């Protein structure tokens, strides 16, 4: 415990809030190029093959990003837009690829929550 005199001299140090997506450097999204597109298995109670991409961002950092939705057209050298947001059952995946932006196409035949997957409104 500091004395009152010590507090007057130095004051309390504010704790800095640690960013959950440091590679974005306080930007809402960042552009990047896919280096590798592959699958990954989730943590213990779940079982699947989640689609992920290793992306080199425009600032030079390489991150692992999740590809949401069913089916995708991404391959090596695809240019994608990356946003923050982790996938709870994939360790080390703290970013998501935005569907419907740049080279990532929207999800086909998507009828609900379309805006999240870059899908156009279906014809009547």
Curated annotation (Swiss-Prot):
Gene Ontology CC entries for this record: small ribosomal subunit
GO BP annotation list: translation
Biased composition (Basic residues): 11-20, 111-124
Region Disordered, residue ranges: 11-30, 105-124
CDD domains hit by this protein: Ribosomal_S12
Highest taxon of source: Bacteria
Pfam family, one: Ribosom_S12_S23
UniProt entry tagged with the keyword Ribonucleoprotein: yes
Coiled coil (residue ranges): none
Residue numbers of 3-methylthioaspartic acid PTMs: 89
Family the UniProt entry places it in: Belongs to the universal ribosomal protein uS12 family.
Subunit structure: Part of the 30S ribosomal subunit. Contacts proteins S8 and S17. May interact with IF1 in the 30S initiation complex.
Protein name: Small ribosomal subunit protein uS12
